[in-house]
Amino acid sequence: MIKVFKLKEIFMDIDFSKIEKIYGKSVIESISILRDDVIKNIEYFIALGFDDAIDIFERQVLIFICPNEEFISKVNTLIKKIGVNYVDEIENDISLLDELL
């Protein structure tokens, strides 16, 4: 329960107005519809060791809006491709996440 509570706090720190301005209202609606999956996807990203998961979420929001199983599969495939230093590689070049779209 503590982990979920912390995640909800993090979710509240997300700048949804910025996301809406960049991606449009339909993306906000999609996040709302798939809220539980989006939260699980952010949680998985944090568990992988990404310290700036919220910033990555705000910049690459579209990759997080999918069923959790699909997200995990895509992320794991990308990690296998990048290798052991995947956190550093992705944090230094966020465009690597474009493969998840």
Q: Could you describe each region identified by the protein language model?
A:
Residues 1-101:
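Long amphipathic alpha-helical repeat/alpha-solenoid cores
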